């Protein structure tokens, strides 16, 4: 059985780790029951109780795992360390605050099963302020023109 690893880096996400855990496990169990899975939280030395909540989630569900950093390694290094620890055939990285819609997990897995090695989600619309969305679009276009490397506009980075 193929295994999906969902990696969720977090820092001070006490309000979100419980809800995102429930949402991800529900999607995986209902829509992708043919796969084994692990949900791995990598905590970046949170100070708001996030760690205790994650420990409770791990105690309740053996498929939920925790990596608890001894210090804050930053938003880029921490997910990398998480990638070194996961055991799945497919990796989906998400942020804890629902910026990445959990409803897209089945679509990502479907595209991966077609043979794609990397599947990336991009924003085509946003609930954020229109001015901020426009400014972000201008930023992406500027970076795209200045860069020698092909850029993906509105790539969330997760």
Regions of interest found by a model, annotated:
Residues 33-45, 67-68:
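Short beta-strand/loop segment that forms part of the nucleotide-sugar
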Residues 13-30:
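Short, well-formed alpha-helical segments that are part of the catalytic scaffolds
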Residues 13-16, 46, 101:
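Donor nucleotide-sugar binding loop of glycosyltransferases
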Residues 28-34, 58-63:
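Short helix-capping segments at alpha-helix termini
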Residues 69-71, 75-85, 90-93, 99-158:
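Acceptor/aglycone-binding surface of glycosyltransferases and processive sugar-polymer synthases
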Residues 40, 51-80, 84-85:
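Conserved donor nucleotide-binding strand/loop of the catalytic core
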Residues 43-51, 98-99:
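A conserved acidic beta->alpha catalytic loop
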Residues 3-5, 38:
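Cell-envelope/extracellular polymer assembly enzymes that use nucleotide-activated donors
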């Amino acid at each position: 059985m193929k295994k999906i690893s969902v990696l969720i880096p977090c820092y001070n996400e006490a309000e979100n780790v419980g809800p995102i855990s429930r949402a991800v496990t529900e999607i995986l169990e209902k829509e992708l029951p043919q796969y084994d899975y692990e949900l791995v939280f990598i905590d970046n030395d949170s100070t708001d109780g996030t760690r205790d909540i994650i420990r409770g989630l791990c105690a309740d569900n053996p498929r939920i795992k925790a990596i608890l950093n001894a210090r804050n390694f930053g938003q880029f290094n921490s997910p990398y360390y998480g990638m070194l620890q996961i055991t799945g055939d497919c990796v989906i990285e998400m942020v804890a605050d629902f910026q990445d819609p959990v409803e897209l997990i089945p679509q990502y897995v479907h595209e991966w099963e077609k043979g794609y090695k990397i599947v990336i989600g991009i924003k085509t619309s946003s609930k954020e302020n229109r001015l901020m969305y426009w400014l972000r679009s201008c930023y992406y276009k500027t970076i795209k023109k200045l860069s020698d490397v092909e850029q993906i506009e509105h790539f969330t980075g997760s």
